Structure formats: structure tokens, C-alpha cells
């Protein structure tokens, strides 16, 4: 578990939580700091023996960079934020290990027409990149349930036959097991303390 914003889980667990590092001595400005945060996350993911990794509150990568760079007048900061986040997704999608699954836990927001979408910052991510389109599987959570398919309100999507129901229990372990079985990836029995 890589936690962007908090150091603890909101429930009892033996899961090892790695808080995203925010102190990099070579970072001369906030742009360098945020690039270093993304590089750190990529190193943790690449070096981890764990087959299932969760990035909790991934939207805070965008939020923290926005606040860090709030006094910058240029729109370049929005380009940097979008490119940093998109590059992290591409890094994960290009991992050489087929059986390593990285989950993004991300908040959603309502659009003007009432549908739900991933919460983002800046026009580049909002208008040019459909964030959900970068992922094969998007599961929408509400009322302690996951929704596996869009219902004209969310952007949830899963391959046909992955789940028997549109509504499933909010159990990330069961989701991970189902994905591994569906794609023939084997179990995620590797435990690692980072």
C-alpha cells in the first residue's frame, strides 16, 4: 500500500503502508519536489516483490502539486501535473511483470450532467485525457459496494464475464482474486515488507 496523503488505513490491518516521501534534499523547487515524488513511487512499484499494490488517494498527487505550486502564475504547472500523472499511469501499464497489479484508489466527482468521473485538476486531464480510459478495469464504489459496470451515472467498466453481478461487495482482495483468475495470473501470495 502506497499512501499519498495518510499514513494509516481507516481499518485494522497488517498491510504495510508506505507513505509517499515528501522530503528530497536535491529538490530546488516544488516542480522538482513533485517530480521526485512520482519517481519515488515508480521505484517502489518497480522494486516491490508484491504482486498487488494499492496507491491510496491517488488524486492527492494532483492536489498536493496544485497546492505546492499555487503561487506560480504560469499554466505550465497544470501541464506538469497532467504529464506527471499520465506518465505514472503509463509506467504502470508498461510494467514487465504481467502478474503485478497496481490499484489506484481515487475520488470521483459529479459532472454537470450528473454522471460520476475520476476527480482531476486542470483542463488537460479533464478534457484531453479520459483518465478512466487509461485503465482496463474501473470499479466505482458507493455505499460500501463496488459497481462493475456503468449505470449511466459512473464510468465503471470491467471485461464481460469478470464478475457475475453489476454490484459486488467492497472487498479489494476478492476483486484482486477475480482479476487474477480471469486473466490466468496466479495468486498474489508474495508478502513484502518495504
Language-model region placement:
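Short, well-ordered beta-strand core segments
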Residues: 1, 102, 138-140
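Conserved P-loop
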Residues: 1-54, 60
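Hydrophobic, Leu/Ile/Phe/Ala-enriched alpha-helical segments that form helix-helix packing faces
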Residues: 41-45, 92-96, 135
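Conserved, well-folded catalytic cores of nucleic-acid-processing
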Residues: 43, 61-64, 134, 138-141
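Short glycine/proline-enriched coil/turn segments at helix->beta-strand junctions
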Residues: 49, 97-99, 142-144
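P-loop NTPase motor core
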Residues: 52-130
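Conserved GTP-binding G-domain of TRAFAC-class P-loop NTPases and closely related GTPase folds
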Residues: 109-194
Amino acid at each position: 500500500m502506497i499512501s499519498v496523503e495518510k499514513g494509516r488505513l481507516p481499518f485494522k490491518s497488517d498491510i504495510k503502508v508506505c507513505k509517499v516521501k515528501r522530503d528530497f534534499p536535491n529538490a530546488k523547487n516544488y516542480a522538482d519536489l513533485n517530480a521526485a515524488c512520482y519517481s519515488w513511487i515508480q521505484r517502489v512499484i518497480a522494486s516491490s516483490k508484491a504482486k498487488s499494490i494499492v496507491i491510496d488517494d491517488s488524486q492527492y498527487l494532483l492536489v498536493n502539486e496544485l497546492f505546492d505550486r499555487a503561487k506560480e502564475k504560469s499554466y505550465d504547472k497544470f501541464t506538469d501535473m497532467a504529464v506527471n500523472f499520465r506518465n505514472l499511469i503509463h509506467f504502470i501499464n508498461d510494467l514487465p511483470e504481467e502478474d503485478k497489479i497496481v490499484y489506484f484508489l481515487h475520488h470521483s466527482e459529479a459532472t454537470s450532467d450528473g454522471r460520476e468521473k475520476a476527480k482531476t485538476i486542470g483542463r488537460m486531464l479533464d478534457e484531453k485525457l479520459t483518465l478512466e480510459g487509461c485503465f482496463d478495469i474501473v470499479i466505482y464504489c458507493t455505499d460500501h459496494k463496488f459497481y462493475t459496470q456503468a449505470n449511466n451515472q459512473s464510468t465503471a467498466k470491467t471485461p464481460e464475464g469478470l464478475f457475475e453481478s453489476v454490484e459486488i461487495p467492497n472487498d479489494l482482495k476478492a476483486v484482486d482474486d477475480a482479476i487474477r483468475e480471469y486473466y490466468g495470473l496466479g495468486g498474489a501470495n508474495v508478502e513484502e515488507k518495504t
